[in-house]
Amino acid sequence: MNTYAAYIDYALKKLDTFPVDMTGGNDNTVLLKDYQLFVAKVFLGLNSMNSILLFQETGVGKTITTVYMLKNLKKIYSEWTIIILVKKALIDDPWTHTILDYAPEVMKDCIIMNYDDQNFHNKFFTNIKSINVKSRIFIIIDECHNFISKSLTKEDNKKRNTKLVYNYIAKNLMQKNNKLICLSATPIVNDVREFQMLVNLLRPGILTPDKSLFYNKKLIDEKEIISKLGCICSYIVNNEASIFEDVENTTLFAKKTVHIKHVFMSKKQEELYLKARYLERKLGISVFKIYQRMASTFVFDDIPDKKKLTEEEYEKFVDSLSIDFKNTLYGKKISKQSLDILSAGGTINDIKDVKDIELYNYLYEHSCKFTFVCVSIIQSKGKCLVFEPFIRSSGIEILLQYFNVFGITYIEFSSRTKDIRSKSVSDFNKVDNTDGEITKVCVFSQSGNEGISFLSINDIFILDMTWNEASLKQIIGRAIRLNSHVNNPPERRYVNVYFVVAKLSSGRSSVDDILLDIIQSKSKEFSQLYKVFKHSSIEWIYSNYTDFQTVDDEKGFKKLISRNIILDENTITNKKKLTMGENIWYSFSSSLVSIHRGFKSMDNKIYDSEGFFITVLPDKPTIKIYEGKLIYILTVR
């Protein structure tokens, strides 16, 4: 690893005189942080370093770092064509706006493309054919985990057109010293194969694609993988804790406090939720739990049986239910007197107005989550975000009816507001709306869980659990960003994160409980792969490997990073050992989101139920009591 460090040092010295800021149109100037300059100098300073992953948490300035590189490209070579592959929602903001603000002179060389476009692959190859043969290509893939997912062969074995673009980039990356930079705060989301595909995009052919990386959930030959992947990424993850862990504030980031809010369904909502569960099993679609997820959030007066209706009949039935519900609420609002009671911390039991009580109970009858969120929003001291992935039927469309009844001002960021959503977010983020006095809340769907920055947020409400921790991290990352709370007074530089979990009166697990457990179980393998990225990053190498001899050129770098990874399963020790200790309960969350069986050895080592080592218990461990059990709260680094 010292050899990698020598080449990093060479690149830094080569570009030592690079500017520390960049100025664009209208004298817009930004001063780069040291870590931003570090990665830019290393990547541009090594001509034969064709690729890098910016594995950096949300809000640290990945876009600014990349635009800085674009601004300084012609100091390396005179002719560049820049291809930026992004989600449609990110084309204008941040990419086009940031380039025009700080590097407008490179805009003429840029081709910005939406990889969600069904015709993306054809447009990509049309643009490739138009590039001058003398030009080098600088490719940027933002939120690269989405691009990788679209290139991955799924269980249906359908052809993925994005894979054609993936193959082209992997094949042509090494030619003419082209450059590829991938950006993501969560490079692995759903599948270990995403790691393999990403590595083979950055370092083509280095890793056998069909060979398993794990044996019994344990990474095979970790040292070999790290040694061959040196300098593959920049790793800036200041908070490696679980999304369910509280994090103290720093000078640059707001404090995060996590709350798991259990809200009991009304009798009516529970009955319809159980019907939704039955219909899912009857229709054979329970694997995605769509019916249950929707019913745990909101229910109409009935749930139609899709099996007995045509698609058109089903849509008409749902539309009629929606219209009936909206008509029932038309013109109705909770009085200011009752809102004042609730905003001061009161409950429904403190309200005296009979009509308000009836209206509140009607709303709660149909959605325990929406009602809880509305009350929480009016009690919040600042601005709020609400994540709701569903738009029609029981999603955002109905939630906004609740907002109207409670007098909550809002903007919506979803697929149905694409023409105005960027402007809406810009207004929402303005300094004169720091306290939410103009617009209190932004409700957003999956369209807004990546690439968008929200400023001065104090409360986030997550109404539906995604299938993985990475997506939840992206959602939370929209509000906790570098200097995102600089306009807040010191006492309000915090973000409360509420996971709103619908509960059944019987105490049985709801779909929200099930999804929380799924999220926890996926993280075991992913955490090992994230460790690989961390220990092969340019930051880790340059900080921890200082015993190197300086180099005068980069002749050997290409060969160093092109070595194949050869996995040896013998590096896994499978022999059973008898260890003395005791059975315990443990959780990775101080909120006790999920509790696991484990084993504590005499020397304070903690193992999971399958015998795999987790961590070493500190001298003064954190222990909580829950339902008569002693629960060890573990922190894994």
Curated annotation (Swiss-Prot):
What GO biological process, any one, is recorded here?
DNA repair
Which positions fall inside the Helicase C-terminal domain? Answer: 358-537
Q: Where is the motif (DEXH box)?
A: 142-145
List the EC numbers from the record. 3.6.1.15
Classify the main location. Answer: virion
UniProt-annotated binding residues for ATP: Q56, E57, T58, G59, V60, G61, K62, T63
Q: Which keywords fit this entry according to its UniProt record? A: ATP-binding, DNA-binding, Hydrolase, Nucleotide-binding, Transcription, Virion
Q: GO CC: one term?
A: virion component
Q: What class of enzyme is it?
A: hydrolase
Q: Which InterPro entries does the protein's record reference?
A: Helicase_ATP-bd, Helicase_C-like, NPHI_C, P-loop_NTPase, SNF2_N
Q: How does it assemble?
A: Monomer. Interacts (via C-terminus) with RAP94 (via N-terminus). Interacts with the cap-specific mRNA (nucleoside-2'-O-)-methyltransferase.
What family is it from? Answer: Belongs to the helicase family. NPH I subfamily.
Q: How is this protein named in the record? A: Nucleoside triphosphatase I
**Organism in which the protein naturally occurs:** Fowlpox virus (strain NVSL)
